[in-house]
Amino acid sequence: RELYNGLYFCQTEDTSMFDLAETIPGPSTETFGALAKELGIVLVLSLFEKRAPGLYHNTAVVLEKDGTIAGKYRKMHIPDDPAYYEKFYFTPGDLGFEPIDTSVGRLGVLVCWDQWYPEAARLMAMRGAEMLIYPTAIGWESSDTQEEKDRQLGAWVTIQRGHAVANGLPVISVNRTGHEPDPSGQTGGIRFWGNSFAAGPQGELLTVFPNDEEEVRVIEIDKTRSENVRRWWPFFRDRRIDAFGGLTERFLV
């Protein structure tokens, strides 16, 4: 999940929260690097990075099976919405959309708000990512109706499954779950909706987690399916890259 080692502090703007930031390498990468080595696994760790005094990022670090740092990604799209005041804390990423090479494949690691932007997923895929991974912190406001909750959750799942389809890649999205109060008391807090999931390269759901409790699961993902799916649905072959120049503009009218 996004910012794994504490509450989602971005519900308020509070300068004391900068004390939570840590360097990379730092305490978390040392602790979880040792765990990755002990278990022989690759870990994706979402952190509040202190790059320098007054300069902070929302960063995902990938730890190799031997405990070393394989690479990191700094969140590019930074929201500033009610209860998600991330621009107060985080500088936009400057590492681009670069997959991270690991012993289990090339990982296209993105973070939360990035998941709403198809361009981010596409650039990761174009640079050879073999799967997309999204540590996430997203949920409902206390005033949301059930209909609004259903719409938001449905949109969140749909767009990420769409990234899987459009790019012929598996997608893994890991979200927070449970209620976290607003420290300022101005709102009823956020009910993080969980529903972490994994989808295959045609958007098929491989597993869906509950919305109200944490679980650990082992899911088998066949990376070779991406090759077959891209042969059937050759979206990369048929892209009209000569006509896409407008995508680098903010708006066209």
PLM segments and residue spans:
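Metal-dependent catalytic neighborhoods of phosphoester/phosphodiester hydrolases
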Residues: 3-24, 53-56
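Short glycine/proline- and charge-enriched loop/turn segments
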Residues: 11-19, 81-82, 142-143, 147
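CN hydrolase (nitrilase-like) catalytic-core segments centered on the catalytic cysteine
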Residues: 24-44, 106, 112-216
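Short beta-strand scaffold segments in enzyme catalytic cores
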Residues: 45-47, 59-62, 98, 196-198, ...
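Short, glycine-anchored, charge-dense loop/turn motifs used at functional sites
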Residues: 58, 62-70, 197-207
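A short, polar/charged loop-to-alpha-helix boundary motif
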Residues: 75-89, 213-230
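Active-site glycine-rich loop that binds ribose-phosphate moieties when present
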Residues: 82-98, 115-117
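Cysteine/selenocysteine-centered motifs that mediate thiol-based redox chemistry or coordinate metal-sulfur cofactors
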Residues: 97-127, 136, 226-253
